[in-house]
Regions:
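Hydrophobic Val/Ile/Leu positions in short beta-strands of Rossmann-like dinucleotide-binding domains
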Residues: 4, 150-152
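Rossmann-fold NAD(P) dinucleotide-binding segment
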Residues: 54-67
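Hydrophobic/small residue at the entry helix of a nucleotide-binding pocket
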Residues: 158
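NAD(P)-binding Rossmann-fold cofactor-contacting core
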Residues: 168-176
Length: 176
């Protein structure tokens, strides 16, 4: 049995077609349940799927005597008490790099928004002040992304995806 703490509609988006053929019972936590209540009602679950911000500590693990694995549906697992899992012989897994591409795109969007006064510019257009905003932007001598040097701390999946995209802008790239 797999107990899924996230909502079914989100899970179904990523669920592979062959999943229906697997001899596994999927149970989804009801929105009105706490994680502990869901664990108590599904004490025979051997695996739980959680999102990156679900707190999974001894209070949940102790309700699941058959638990063998906690799987984060994302990259993060910092809300899972890994020490408590280790003490109980429970594996903790994540989806390394699964969202690197979308995080890289989001990162570059934020860079462009900052360089191009995205939010103030949007607000100025709504208020009919786009000419005044244009003058402020020009006076600020804001560089284009191609004129920037970008430093990436670490060079894992997300940084590599970001670097690939930034290369097309022509900026200088550095990583540590």
């Amino acid at each position: 049995k797999i107990l899924v703490f996230g909502p079914r509609d989100r899970y179904d988006v990523y669920r592979p077609p062959f999943a229906d053929e697997m001899p596994v019972e999927l149970v989804f936590r009801r929105p009105d349940q706490t994680y502990v209540q869901a664990a108590q009602e599904n004490a025979d679950a051997r695996i739980i799927f959680v999102d990156a911000i679900t707190d999974v500590g001894p209070d949940v693990m102790d309700q699941l005597p058959e638990l063998k694995m906690i799987h984060s549906e994302g990259v993060g697992y910092n809300c899972i008490d890994c020490q408590a899992a280790r003490e109980r012989g429970i594996y903790v897994c994540n989806n390394k790099g699964c969202n690197a591409e979308s995080v890289a795109e989001h990162t570059i969007m934020l860079m462009l928004m900052a360089l191009r006064f995205g939010i103030p510019g949007h607000n100025a257009v709504i208020q009919g002040q786009q000419i005044q905003m244009k003058q402020k932007a020009i006076a600020a001598h804001a560089p284009g992304l191609f004129q920037c040097a970008v430093g990436l701390v670490g060079f894992g999946d997300t940084a590599q995806a970001t670097a690939r995209r930034l290369a097309s802008f022509g900026c200088k790239l550095y990583y540590y």
